């Protein structure tokens, strides 16, 4: 299914359809303009996505195109090697993912890099995820990159820290800023080896 950028109008098999409310099966491709996709976490809405006033069902993937495209409506985002998955649909070339409320972002089994922006905001590759409260980084050698004045709060649990109101788990590295310990007993380790300046392990 090829979006047209006009409500209720799509193209498929070289046929232009107008006044369409529903389309079933397959994949969706966006326009060269700004496309807005909506999904839901409600039961029974898996593999459904809405765009241009059309409800697409049993969809496996959405390729948005080259613009500031958005997807909204979910609180569960799962990173892929490229793009991400939500509601059973793989999304590619999305610039912004807007959560409806406190959201969880899950990393891959490979090394992921998370760039902190504002509060509850994480950038992965070319996608900004908004209203995120939890990030489960995954099994790879994962890192979080903050601003020069980034504040990292230890949790007292291995590989788990808090930053920008986001609880990160399964994290191996954090870059930039300052570190604040817990109310418990914290152990910090440094090294005199060359190339380890400004590094600390906790």
Task: Kindly label every feature range from the protein language model.
Residues 1-202:
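Acidic, glycine-rich low-complexity segments
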């Amino acid at each position: 299914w090829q979006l047209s950028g006009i409500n209720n109008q799509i193209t498929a098999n070289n046929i232009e359809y107008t006044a369409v409310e529903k389309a079933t099966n397959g994949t969706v491709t966006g326009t060269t303009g700004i496309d807005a996709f909506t999904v839901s976490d409600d039961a029974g809405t898996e593999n459904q996505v809405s765009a241009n006033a059309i409800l697409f069902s049993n969809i496996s993937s959405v390729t948005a195109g080259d613009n500031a495209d958005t997807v909204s409506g979910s609180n569960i985002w799962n990173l892929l090697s490229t793009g991400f998955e939500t509601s059973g649909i793989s999304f590619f070339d999305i610039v912004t993912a807007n959560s409806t409320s406190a959201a969880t972002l899950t990393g891959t089994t490979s090394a992921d890099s998370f760039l902190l922006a504002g509060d509850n905001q994480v950038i992965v590759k070319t996608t900004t995820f908004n209203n995120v409260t939890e990030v489960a980084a995954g099994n790879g050698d994962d890192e979080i990159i903050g601003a020069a004045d980034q504040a990292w709060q230890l949790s007292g649990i291995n590989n788990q820290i808090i930053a920008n109101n986001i609880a990160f788990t399964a994290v191996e590295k954090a870059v930039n800023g300052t570190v604040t310990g817990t109310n418990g007993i914290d152990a910090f380790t440094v090294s005199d080896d060359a190339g380890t300046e400004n590094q600390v392990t906790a």
